[in-house]
């Protein structure tokens, strides 16, 4: 067990040396499952079955999982729900599943590549007032970005994005090295043996939002755009022929003919759009990793810290080697 001895949430809420239990609710569930026989929940849908590794499941999360299992595009995928499951946008946080030839950009979400950069520090004591001042002065949070792009911009070329015309490249470049908002944080943890760990939790900032929303909209247009075009063409033709009394009946018939039982949040991309999304998602994941490393660089340099070991964990991404999606799990 670790304890947080200093931390900064975004917006900032810095406290020291206050003891805060890490992931208290998650630990409670894990302890509960260890103390008794593990109970898994199985949710059967029209096209798939999800296995939930938890004895407890809120109703909103259950409904979202059921909806995913009822979609034909997920037939054949392996769906596993982690113990930290809770309702999210489009699908539950805690979703892990295999991907085939279709992907819902909204399931990865707008914070593509969100994760944590962890650095074991050689130091055993930290001047927290100095650290607090450094973070507030040098690391933008909320909607703010850097005035001058961080040097790590040299390690990525965002002009390679296939949706580059949908992205504010200048803002993206100045976002590397910024914390963002929501549940993102910077903290120092102490292990039971006294070692200190710097942890930075952040993602792809507004770039991830731009990429995700572009492909989600493209997916919706691909699925429903043709139907909208046919409806408008029929209306124009009926007006030209003076058959105004038939317009409403024709609209109703065409909408019924092209009706799709797919929630808008689960609109998927396939084919060329699938390839383009995977390409841009991987580049955005690299951006998120560099963003965290840039913040670590600012802190390590400003504080004069020495790193013993560094590692990254990601919890909002698709492993493109194994084609496995992880949504906050």
Model-derived features with residue positions:
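Domain-length cofactor-binding catalytic modules of enzymes
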Residues: 38-67, 74-81, 87-93, 102-105, ...
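A generic, well-ordered mixed alpha/beta core segment in the N-terminal half of proteins
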Residues: 105-160
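Glycine-rich phosphate/pyrophosphate-binding loop regions near the starts of catalytic domains
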Residues: 96-97
């Amino acid at each position: 067990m670790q304890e947080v001895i200093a931390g900064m949430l975004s917006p900032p809420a810095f406290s020291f040396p206050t003891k805060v239990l890490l992931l208290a609710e998650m630990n409670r569930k894990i302890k509960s499952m260890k103390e008794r026989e593990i109970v898994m929940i199985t949710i059967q849908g029209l096209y798939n079955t999800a296995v939930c590794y938890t004895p407890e499941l809120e109703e909103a999360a259950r409904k979202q999982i059921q909806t995913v299992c009822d979609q034909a595009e997920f037939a054949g995928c392996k769906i596993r729900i982690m113990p930290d499951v809770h309702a999210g946008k489009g699908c539950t946080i805690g979703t892990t599943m295999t991907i085939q030839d279709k992907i819902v950009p909204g399931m990865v979400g707008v914070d593509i590549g969100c994760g944590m950069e962890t650095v074991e520090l050689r130091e055993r004591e930290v001047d927290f007032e100095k650290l607090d001042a450094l973070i507030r002065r040098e690391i933008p949070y909320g909607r703010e970005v850097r005035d001058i792009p961080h040097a790590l911009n040299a390690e990525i070329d965002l002009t390679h994005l296939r949706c580059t015309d949908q992205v504010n490249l200048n803002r993206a470049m100045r976002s590397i090295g910024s914390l963002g908002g929501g549940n993102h944080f910077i903290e120092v943890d102490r292990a039971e043996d006294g070692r200190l760990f710097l942890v930075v939790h952040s993602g792809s900032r507004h770039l991830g939002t731009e990429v995700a929303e572009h492909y989600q909209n493209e997916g919706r247009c691909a699925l429903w755009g043709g139907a909208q075009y046919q409806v408008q063409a029929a209306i124009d033709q009926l007006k030209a022929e003076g058959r105004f009394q038939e317009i409403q009946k024709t609209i109703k018939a065409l909408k019924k003919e092209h009706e799709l039982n797919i929630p808008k949040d689960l609109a998927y991309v396939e084919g060329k759009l699938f390839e383009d999304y995977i390409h841009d998602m991987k580049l955005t994941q690299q951006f998120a990793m560099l963003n965290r490393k840039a913040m670590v660089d600012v802190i390590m340099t400003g504080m004069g810290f020495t790193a013993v070991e560094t590692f990254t964990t990601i919890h909002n991404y698709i492993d493109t080697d194994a084609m496995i999606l992880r949504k906050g799990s």
